[in-house]
Amino acid sequence: MNINDVKRAVSEIKEKSPQRKFEESVEIAVNLKDVDMSNPKNRINEEILLPNGRGKDVKIAVFGSDELKSKARGVADFVFGAEDISKFAEDKKAFKKIVNQAYFFIAEATLMANIGKSLGQVLGPRGKMPRPIPPGQDPAPLIKNLKNTVKARSRNALTFHVPVGTRSMDADKISENIMTVINRITGKLERGASNIRSIYVKTTMGNAVEIKAGDEK
């Protein structure tokens, strides 16, 4: 499978999918084969920085000291202190609302143990345990990268979906994003591309188009 295979499929979904009244996301569906998903070691759980970004904003939440909070304001979407950990531990319903909105969490390294103990049961199953950041470090570069990062998580299923952009993005840029994701996933599979049955690309409301490897029309 090469970039030209991907470009053909992306061009087809953009041509055949009518314009909607909202910005559609573009995602790929990866179908694996001959992989024992009952073994956690075989599951895909990757965070992938897209070279051309996601095409849309995602929210980032930060837990930190006063210094980190000050640096994160205006860059992160949610900023919390150590005192908020205990508050959220007592009000899990309120915290779940934040978790449903934030795509990634960042936490000062010194707070990680407390967050794991108090909020891990909410964050863990959703794959949203915070990324630790050293005390005093500027969080802005990490936040910028995370806003352009996607998660590829198979859990225990042979089929999983990964966002790769939005419909309004240039087809070449979407294709480059897709190749980045495919290359990462392929590199994590025991037999590489031989463990991939098929890959489809689609917009939110559009029909899926298979990316056919080696199709040189």
From Swiss-Prot:
Family matches, as SUPFAM superfamilies: Ribosomal protein L1
One GO MF term attached to the UniProt entry: structural constituent of ribosome
Extent of the signal sequence: none
InterPro entries hit by this protein: Ribosomal_uL1 (IPR002143), Ribosomal_uL1-like (IPR023674), Ribosomal_uL1/biogenesis (IPR028364), Ribosomal_uL1_3-a/b-sand (IPR016095), Ribosomal_uL1_arc (IPR023669), Ribosomal_uL1_CS (IPR023673)
Alphabetical GO biological process terms: regulation of translation; translation
Keyword entries, A-Z: Repressor, Ribonucleoprotein, Ribosomal protein, RNA-binding, rRNA-binding, Translation regulation, tRNA-binding
UniProt-listed PROSITE patterns: RIBOSOMAL_L1
Keyword Amino-acid biosynthesis: no
Pfam families, sorted: Ribosomal_L1 (PF00687)
Source taxon at top rank: Archaea
GO cellular component terms attached to this protein's record: large ribosomal subunit
Entry keyword annotation includes Transcription: no
Function: Binds directly to 23S rRNA. Probably involved in E site tRNA release. Protein L1 is also a translational repressor protein, it controls the translation of its operon by binding to its mRNA.
Family under the similarity heading: Belongs to the universal ribosomal protein uL1 family.
Subunit structure: Part of the 50S ribosomal subunit.
Name of the molecule in the record: Large ribosomal subunit protein uL1
